Amino acid sequence: MTESTASVLYEVRGAVALVTLNRPQALNSFTREMHHALWAAFDQAEGNPAVRALVLTGAGRGFCAGLDLSELDFTPGPGLLERADPGPVINDAFNPTTRRLQSLRMPVICAVNGVAAGAGASVAMACDIAIAAPTASFVQAFSKIGLIPDAGGSWLLVERLGL
């Protein structure tokens, strides 16, 4: 996971694990493979007793644009609703990621360097602390596309606001 073509980069700097979402050409939108690579980075950090904190950030101009829609199949025809349903990837990938972020044995700091959209915003909110650059923005536009917030977004937003 250290080569520059990996979807998630992992490095240790002193007592800090730096985890970088590394698909800048797609605004670091998540694929299933990327979730698995992120979980492996979490395992590395937790398995290293020298690591006392984790920083999560994105490469390029965005933090994370949420789900990479190429993970879904929008080909017209029978079964379209099942193939285009984001539910399975939310349940199998995003939900475990946000739960895992909240259960790591160390503080997790999200360095939001650009747009954090949809489930990407939920991932940022699942961290213990989010630090937003002047270029950062948080977008929850689910209602505009007929969805409800996923990856714990509804609960995490209320929690972070202290309501």
Place the predicted regions along the sequence by residue.
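Crotonase-fold acyl-CoA enzyme core
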Residues: 99-163
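Charged catalytic carboxylate motif
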Residues: 33, 37, 93, 100
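Hydrophobic/aromatic residues within transmembrane alpha-helices
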Residues: 19, 56, 68, 123-124
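Conserved CoA-thioester-binding segment of acyl-CoA-metabolizing enzymes
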Residues: 1-59, 75
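Glycine- (often His-adjacent) and acidic-residue-rich active-site loop
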Residues: 58-99, 116, 146
